[in-house]
């Protein structure tokens, strides 16, 4: 049952001590804490404290994990501005013919027609051109040379002179190893500018143990972009729109889901991006889960009816984020806030490198 507060952004706020923002992962990926939510009572704190490693003993042989196989690219580029000075581009997505949507800084000094210089070595530079402002995102359309038409070609350039685009709450000076730590073990398809962080918990050893126990793993692709990480701003959520992100749900994954359900298993999404991809594919199939490739901007908030997933492995998310809305759609906003307060009291670590929550099928409202 929805109440009016479910459509107010301020209803998804909470206070987090800064020292609970994880600056690096646990020593082993699967050593993170795991809060297991046990039932669907809105006022209940029926939960178990465990480790992510224990998930192998919680899931059953017929169950299925669905992971996101996107790979984070080194999308942050340092550039020189027309008229002098330094700037920065965050590569977002291809727009065809060597043009890319980018977030620029300082944006006020990137006007249509301006040239930018990207140093690819000590003696060589690429000349880029600002085409126009993108009104939907506030970003800039930047012209690269025509050889950079897709993420495959662009990644070669980014590997040469780009940096991993870490979230602003991670202090780059306090930790290292991000090129490896900020990728999941399934990362194979370039195109994300942020990691699907729940997947970071699955170590090679844990993956092998899951398979030995008969727990299957299927993959989707959602290139994490503005739709996932851009902060929400408008208080009224009734007309919320998110930036589109590219997804792919394959026939192979659909067969795995069908088999799982036929055998009485449960489908657990690993991360909110896997939820969005699967539920968007279902809606695009008009009531049937079919292969899908393209952009989606699905909003999942309280009142949403889930049709594919039964449970969710997810991290603890930022206040007032679309990810908190999705978690609230599964377990209720009031309960989500109580669980987050409990996590803070028990020193759970938050955000990208932080601990995890397992929302079990019996806890979904």
Swiss-Prot record:
Disulfide bonds: none annotated. One of its GO terms (molecular function) is S-adenosylmethionine:tRNA ribosyltransferase-isomerase activity. Pfam families: Queuosine_synth. GO terms for cellular component: cytoplasm. The keyword Ribonucleoprotein does not apply. Gene3D superfamilies: QueA-like. This is S-adenosylmethionine:tRNA ribosyltransferase-isomerase.
């Amino acid at each position: 049952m929805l109440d009016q507060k479910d459509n107010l952004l301020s209803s998804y706020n909470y206070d987090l001590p800064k020292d609970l923002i994880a600056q690096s992962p646990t020593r082993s990926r699967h050593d993170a804490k795991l809060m297991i939510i046990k039932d669907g009572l809105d006022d209940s704190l029926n939960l178990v404290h465990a480790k992510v490693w224990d998930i192998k003993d919680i899931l059953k042989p017929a169950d299925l994990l669905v992971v996101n196989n996107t790979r984070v690219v080194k999308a942050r580029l340092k550039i020189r501005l027309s008229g002098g000075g330094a700037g920065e581009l965050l590569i977002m997505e291809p727009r065809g013919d060597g043009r890319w949507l980018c977030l620029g800084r300082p944006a006020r000094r990137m006007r249509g027609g301006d040239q930018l210089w990207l140093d690819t070595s000590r003696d060589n530079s690429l000349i880029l051109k600002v085409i126009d402002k993108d009104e939907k995102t506030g970003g800039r359309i930047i012209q690269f040379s025509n050889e950079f038409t897709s993420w495959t070609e662009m990644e070669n350039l980014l590997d040469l002179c780009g940096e991993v685009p870490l979230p602003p709450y991670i202090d780059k000076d306090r930790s290292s190893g991000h090129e490896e730590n900020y990728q999941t073990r399934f990362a194979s398809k370039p195109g994300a500018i942020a990691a699907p962080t729940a997947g970071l918990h699955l170590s090679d050893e844990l993956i092998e143990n899951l398979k030995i126990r008969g727990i299957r793993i299927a993959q989707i692709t959602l290139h994490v972009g503005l739709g996932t990480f851009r902060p929400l701003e408008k208080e009224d959520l009734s007309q919320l729109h998110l930036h589109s992100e590219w997804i792919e749900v394959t026939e192979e994954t659909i067969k795995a889901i069908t088999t799982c359900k036929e055998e009485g298993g449960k489908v657990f999404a690993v991360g909110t991006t896997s939820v969005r991809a699967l539920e968007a594919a279902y809606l695009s199939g008009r009531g049937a889960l079919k292969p899908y490739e393209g952009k989606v901007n699905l909003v999942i908030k309280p009142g949403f009816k889930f049709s594919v997933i039964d449970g969710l492995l997810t991290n603890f998310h930022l206040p007032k984020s679309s990810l908190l809305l999705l978690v609230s759609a599964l377990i209720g906003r009031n309960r989500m806030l109580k669980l987050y307060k409990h996590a803070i009291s028990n020193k759970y670590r938050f955000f990208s490198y932080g601990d995890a929550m397992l929302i079990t099928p019996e806890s979904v409202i």
